[in-house]
Amino acid sequence: MIPIVIEESGRGERAFDIYSRLLRERIIFLGEAVTSDSANRIVAQMLFLEAEDPEKDIYLYINSPGGSVYDGLGIFDTMQHIKPDVQTVCVGLAASMGAFLLCAGTKGKRSSLQHSRIMIHQPLGGASGQASDIRIQADEILYLKDRLNTELSDRTGQPLDRIQEDTDRDFFMSPGEAVSYGLIDSVIDKRPVQAVA
């Protein structure tokens, strides 16, 4: 069930689902696995926000176990294509493609809440059928592994051989460790207290 927010204005009350209300504040929330449906929603929201104001940052909050590499790369490419900076924030878990998207935010604007977990690893896949079909799938997985590792190396500043070694198996990090690694830029402890006028 999606929560509804009710706002009052001079013309009466208006109800929004919570995600539509957040979108008005330029906040996109990835709170599920990366699938064709979730990726299409996120890409559409980013394109909408760019059209609405190409100068204002977009905020992508991530709590995701990962998911489809192809769909995640669609989000990644859109993040690189649009004009607004994309600030990424991990809330809970950014694993696999979730961690890749977290790292894909604008450098200097990638962060995590203090008790979140971040995990990188190599792409997963499976194949069945004739030997030639299995080889095609294996070659594709190796290609994707190379692309993802190269992007992680470019975005973290880590040498490619270290990325290859660290992504060979599940590699979990705390937010502080992710800052040291170069996946994110800061850990959010608490919101600054607003001065009361």
Swiss-Prot record:
InterPro entries for the chain: ClpP (IPR001907), ClpP/crotonase-like_dom_sf (IPR029045), ClpP/TepA (IPR023562), ClpP_Ser_AS (IPR018215)
Protein source organism: Synechococcus sp. (strain CC9902)
GO MF term set: ATP-dependent peptidase activity; ATPase binding; serine-type endopeptidase activity
Enzyme class: hydrolase
Main subcellular location of this protein, as a coarse class: cytoplasm
HAMAP family recorded: ClpP (MF_00444)
Gene Ontology biological process terms, A to Z: protein quality control for misfolded or incompletely synthesized proteins
Entry annotation: catalytic residues: S96, H121
Keywords from the named record: Cytoplasm, Hydrolase, Protease, Serine protease
Subcellular location(s) per record: Cytoplasm
Subunit comment: Fourteen ClpP subunits assemble into 2 heptameric rings which stack back to back to give a disk-like structure with a central cavity, resembling the structure of eukaryotic proteasomes.
Source species, domain of life: Bacteria
Catalytic reaction annotation: Hydrolysis of proteins to small peptides in the presence of ATP and magnesium. alpha-casein is the usual test substrate. In the absence of ATP, only oligopeptides shorter than five residues are hydrolyzed (such as succinyl-Leu-Tyr-|-NHMec, and Leu-Tyr-Leu-|-Tyr-Trp, in which cleavage of the -Tyr-|-Leu- and -Tyr-|-Trp bonds also occurs)
Annotated GO CC locations: cytoplasm; endopeptidase Clp complex
Protein name: ATP-dependent Clp protease proteolytic subunit 1
Lineage: Bacteria, Bacillati, Cyanobacteriota, Cyanophyceae, Synechococcales
PROSITE patterns per UniProt: CLP_PROTEASE_SER (PS00381)
Annotated family: Belongs to the peptidase S14 family.
Role of this protein: Cleaves peptides in various proteins in a process that requires ATP hydrolysis. Has a chymotrypsin-like activity. Plays a major role in the degradation of misfolded proteins.
E.C. code: 3.4.21.92
